């Protein structure tokens, strides 16, 4: 492991650069730098040589040409183990550059600005940076490349412990990270440019929602024991730029390793529970809510959600959108077996009680507003991409199509069951009252079958549906679903309408004295 003698540091994100450069200086490393990075280091008293002085060639073209010079790239790419390379470098006065610390122009931050022009974006496409990164990464056996300032402390510690040298393992891992960095950067540029309309020369082009070539980067969080079934292999990846409040930000406080199905179900539970403003509990089984409730506190919300379907809740995922206390956890552990318990925070007492069930996975997830930019679904040889279903119902946009108007309580219940229905697999029917689900019918090919299942769930739970409300994630194709709902004593229905037989459905509601509200928004979930 030869010691590092010369480093080139050129950073957009300069976090920790001074401290790292000071460590290099103590180890006798000569530092080359450019522009703002050179000034930062010099102002901090770090000896630094400007790249222009080192190459004898000035920075030019508004900074577009700074490091694109044989003395830089020859010093990075030259193989120390090949006599021919060594001789050529000596012939042309090219010295070795053993360490390159580069991160790239902030392209993502630039295009995220609301008034970003195409010219702004183009000027923030880094050329020299990726070239140095790839050169150093390619020659990893002889050169170390650092693209993430978060790595500075670990690299500095290893250099100090090894007389200024880095191990082959470290250099190779840094190389892999560097190539991933430039791949993600180029993918981001491609996404932006291929999202633009073709009228580039006639003015500012419009930015479309979907690029003509779709690039995304993911970071592996863990290999899993198996996938959806034991014979399938699986891993969990995190979006390189995850949305705020995403499940991927979870912190596991106790329990066994999360399985593939745990993560899938936990995501369904978390997306549902964080959609409620009031304290809420969502219990999920096989990615479907089997009980949902809102209440004044987490304990009450859990009790109400649990009674919807105590059988299906067994082995489920339980999610809250408020801090969970010890009393709530005790009630849960007394009632049922669960796979995952999740909330934005737990009290010390809650964690102490949960610890008695050492296999239960307890997750803390930041409760922040946010949604993935895109939802992805693989099909054979392709990918379906759509924006997420984050529509929030506004009562002012709803239309009453029945003779009877909903009461104020029915309005509240309709809003609640409609929000639950959005997270239930289609065909979805949800019955509820007083902020509590009374019956959930999910995933049936026939809407009337989902309706019958929801009714049976309420009957099994001894929940009286008289005066309850119903939500359907899509229109009723026939009046039979309304007739079954009416048989249960339900007094108000919310659904999107849009069927050829809408009027028959509306008439059925009037025949039964049901208040019917239409949304003009559908919530299919497959």
Swiss-Prot record:
One of its GO terms (biological process) is 'de novo' IMP biosynthetic process. It catalyses: (6R)-10-formyltetrahydrofolate + 5-amino-1-(5-phospho-beta-D-ribosyl)imidazole-4-carboxamide = 5-formamido-1-(5-phospho-D-ribosyl)imidazole-4-carboxamide + (6S)-5,6,7,8-tetrahydrofolate; IMP + H2O = 5-formamido-1-(5-phospho-D-ribosyl)imidazole-4-carboxamide. The keyword Transferase applies. It comes from the Bacteria. One of its GO terms (molecular function) is phosphoribosylaminoimidazolecarboxamide formyltransferase activity. Its EC number is 2.1.2.3, 3.5.4.10. GO terms for cellular component: cytosol. InterPro entries: AICAR_Tfase_dup_dom_sf, Cytidine_deaminase-like, MGS-like_dom, MGS-like_dom_sf, PurH-like. Residues 1-147 form the MGS-like domain. Belongs to the PurH family. This is Bifunctional purine biosynthesis protein PurH. It comes from Neisseria meningitidis serogroup C / serotype 2a (strain ATCC 700532 / DSM 15464 / FAM18). The gene is purH.
